[in-house]
């Protein structure tokens, strides 16, 4: 399924045990993100969504499950990231961005957060999502209008331009992540769709000012070992150029 046997086994266990915990509240489980696009590699987050009949508030058993899985030897166990979302909320874009039970990459605990409650997540799930259990994702999510994606992208662009100027968390992970994410946002603004990181950067290399091409190419090349890079300082020259890039594109 994913091309990684140990990840397939982990996902199968996750789905089986979540289904057992939720019982008749379980609707389905899905992969989104890089694995849905078919561009994942050994450094990718494992983006999942569990769809439920209602907002799950009794989290004790799920918390225990995620804490246990996080302790497994396979590195994939520390890179699960996803939310538990009611089918009624998932169906169409939620203007309120209701917080959901969310497992962050690297975390062993669910927290209440709207991370997956976005137009982008719905679009990726509907158009590319992989069903681990339950009906096809297209049966659960209405088409996401391009203008909804563009509206969200405009807000995201402002947020990321602001984040570029926050000095306290600059590191070797943030710098290329910011460049790639800005390329994805710009592609969505231009085309009203959502594509993979690689496809968005390829688009950027065709469409953006050549000044930014070395920055985009570098961001693609330094992808391996994101955890290690998180604890390393960002290259000062790349940091300055990334801030300039964020400022320039946020004025488009």
Regions inferred by a protein language model and the residue ranges of each:
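Helical scaffold of the NTase/Pol beta-like nucleotidyltransferase catalytic core
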Residues: 1-29, 58-61
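Conserved NTP/Mg2+-binding pocket subregion across the NTase superfamily
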Residues: 1-3, 64-172, 179
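Catalytic metal-binding acidic patch
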Residues: 29-68, 79-86
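Short, solvent-exposed loop/turn segments at secondary-structure junctions
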Residues: 36, 89, 184-187
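Conserved nucleotidyltransferase catalytic core and NTase-mimicking acidic/glycine-rich helix/loop elements
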Residues: 123-252
